[in-house]
Amino acid sequence: MTTIVSVRRNGHVVIAGDGQATLGNTVMKGNVKKVRRLYNDKVIAGFAGGTADAFTLFELFERKLEMHQGHLVKAAVELAKDWRTDRMLRKLEALLAVADENASLIITGNGDVIQPENDLIAIGSGGPYAQAAARALLENTELSAREIAEKALGIAGDICIYTNHFHTIEELNSKA
């Protein structure tokens, strides 16, 4: 799978992801970019799960952002509704972490749109490791959002066999 982590701190929000793509037990590619900017660089998003499924969801999410003039929560709720109710979309296996200057959300195929505590998101196979590391760093250091995301992703990569050390990181200024 993968690890995606998002941290919001001191006027910045970051989403970072590793680059490993696996097929069964085999690493197929080590430099996949699972984090990208959407909607005129005002939204950042990362995915965990099937690559083709995630790219389909990115496209659909960007359309929802366009329909709702970039309103992150409305676009996320609409995507989650479609994902849950459409027979073809329901088969897509991925999780999305998305953020803009105001909010950080997890979007699932079950129709869930979750705004996590402390605006800390960690999804994918290495998610629990990254979340524990990021939480400890948030509570005990003055590191920036970017530094926390990098360190948390590095720790997840040391522990999770489905997470590597090729990182893609996107950052936005944040109001929260």
Swiss-Prot record:
Pfam families referenced in this protein's UniProt entry, alphabetically? Proteasome
Keyword annotations for this protein? Allosteric enzyme, Cytoplasm, Hydrolase, Metal-binding, Protease, Sodium, Threonine protease
Q: Which GO terms describe its biological process?
A: proteolysis involved in protein catabolic process
Top EC group: hydrolase
Q: Where is the active site?
A: 2
Quaternary structure? A double ring-shaped homohexamer of HslV is capped on each side by a ring-shaped HslU homohexamer. The assembly of the HslU/HslV complex is dependent on binding of ATP.
Q: What is this protein called?
A: ATP-dependent protease subunit HslV
In terms of superkingdom, the source organism counts as Bacteria
- Higher taxonomy: Bacteria, Pseudomonadati, Pseudomonadota, Gammaproteobacteria, Enterobacterales
Reactions performed catalytically: ATP-dependent cleavage of peptide bonds with broad specificity
- GO MF annotation: an example: threonine-type endopeptidase activity
NCBIfam families membership: ATP_dep_HslV, PRK05456.1
Recorded hits in InterPro entries, A to Z, give:
ATP-dep_Prtase_HsIV_su (IPR022281), Ntn_hydrolases_N (IPR029055), Proteasome_sua/b (IPR001353), Proteasome_suB-type (IPR023333)
Functionally, this protein is described as follows: Protease subunit of a proteasome-like degradation complex believed to be a general protein degrading machinery.
Record-stated family: Belongs to the peptidase T1B family. HslV subfamily.
* Record: residues binding Na(+): 157, 160, 163
A GO cellular component annotation here is: proteasome core complex
Q: Which organism is it from?
A: Enterobacter sp. (strain 638)
Its localization reads: Cytoplasm
Primary residence: cytoplasm
Q: How does its activity get regulated?
A: Allosterically activated by HslU binding.
Gene symbol of the encoding locus: hslV
The enzyme's E.C. designation: 3.4.25.2
